[in-house]
């Protein structure tokens, strides 16, 4: 099944190329545009990527612990709300989906850091 050429050209215009390559297990800092009334500001959301979905057109899920509560946020790759994504560190994992981290607390939820280029 191939994509219609018109749809393919449209997708190429919409797709973002400024996002770094990251995989589940990487810790990323996502700068999110927040609009409050007339003002617009950037808010950082830093956490572990626990899932990527549907390739280039898809989304990724970031999880962090805030004041003892787990917080997950799903970001579409082509969202206008995302200002930038920075990869902070990489970790060694053997799964594509890290949903098991939801049930772990404290030291058990740590991931082993690894050097990647």
UniProtKB/Swiss-Prot annotation:
Matching entries from InterPro entries are given as: Ribosomal_bL19 (IPR001857), Ribosomal_bL19_sf (IPR038657), Translation_prot_SH3-like_sf (IPR008991)
User: What keywords are assigned to this protein?
Assistant: Ribonucleoprotein, Ribosomal protein
Name a GO molecular-function annotation.
structural constituent of ribosome
Q: Do you know which Pfam families this protein is assigned to?
A: Ribosomal_L19 (PF01245)
The Gene Ontology biological process annotation of the record reads: translation
Give GO cellular component annotations, separated by semicolons: cytosolic large ribosomal subunit
- Function, as annotated: This protein is located at the 30S-50S ribosomal subunit interface and may play a role in the structure and function of the aminoacyl-tRNA binding site.
Q: Which family does it belong to?
A: Belongs to the bacterial ribosomal protein bL19 family.
Q: What is this protein called?
A: Large ribosomal subunit protein bL19
Originating species: Acidobacterium capsulatum (strain ATCC 51196 / DSM 11244 / BCRC 80197 / JCM 7670 / NBRC 15755 / NCIMB 13165 / 161)
Organism placement in taxonomy: Bacteria, Pseudomonadati, Acidobacteriota, Terriglobia, Terriglobales
């Amino acid at each position: 099944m191939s994509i219609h050429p018109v749809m393919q050209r449209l997708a190429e215009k919409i797709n973002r190329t400024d996002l770094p390559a990251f995989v589940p297990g990487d810790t990323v800092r996502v700068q999110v545009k927040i609009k409050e009334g007339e003002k617009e500001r950037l808010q950082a959301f830093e956490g572990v990527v626990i899932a990527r979905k549907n390739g280039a057109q898809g989304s990724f899920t970031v999880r962090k612990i805030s004041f003892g509560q787990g917080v997950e946020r799903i970001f579409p790759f082509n969202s206008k709300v995302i200002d930038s994504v920075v990869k902070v560190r990489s970790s060694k994992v053997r799964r594509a989906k890290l949903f098991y981290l939801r049930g772990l607390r404290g030291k058990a939820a740590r991931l082993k850091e690894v050097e990647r280029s």
